[in-house]
Amino acid sequence: MNAKKQSRIRRATRSRSKIRELRETRLCVNRTPRHIYAQIISPESDKVLASASTLDKDLRSGATGNIDAATAVGKLIAERAKAAGVTKVAFDRSGFKFHGRVKALADAARESGLEF
């Protein structure tokens, strides 16, 4: 594994351990060069309460690997989280920089009603 990926995984592990101490529901984001994924995860049992990605049928017709797609995923995950009864989350960026697609997803989720 290269040093850049090791550094990202180390950052992700550190932030996840801090979020676990808070005992709060988390919004976990993962990105690949082609897609972006978001999950709402319960603090008690690590159970997925809601999820959204660019692979969903609702979003598949549009672009998949850009900021517009990340914004659409952010709006969709916020809607699904509210439907599951979640309004407040801790943002888990999985060690990625808070920039570009990750930031676009977070901003869209905030605008759609999630608090973090």
Curated annotation (Swiss-Prot):
Pfam families: Ribosomal_L18p (PF00861). One of its GO terms (biological process) is translation. Keywords: Ribonucleoprotein, Ribosomal protein, RNA-binding, rRNA-binding. It comes from Teredinibacter turnerae (strain ATCC 39867 / T7901). This is Large ribosomal subunit protein uL18. This is one of the proteins that bind and probably mediate the attachment of the 5S RNA into the large ribosomal subunit, where it forms part of the central protuberance. GO terms for molecular function: 5S rRNA binding; structural constituent of ribosome. Gene3D superfamilies: 3.30.420.100. GO terms for cellular component: cytosolic large ribosomal subunit. Part of the 50S ribosomal subunit; part of the 5S rRNA/L5/L18/L25 subcomplex. Contacts the 5S and 23S rRNAs. PANTHER family: 39S RIBOSOMAL PROTEIN L18, MITOCHONDRIAL, LARGE RIBOSOMAL SUBUNIT PROTEIN UL18M. InterPro entries: Ribosomal_uL18_bac-type, Ribosomal_uL18_bac/euk. It comes from the Bacteria.
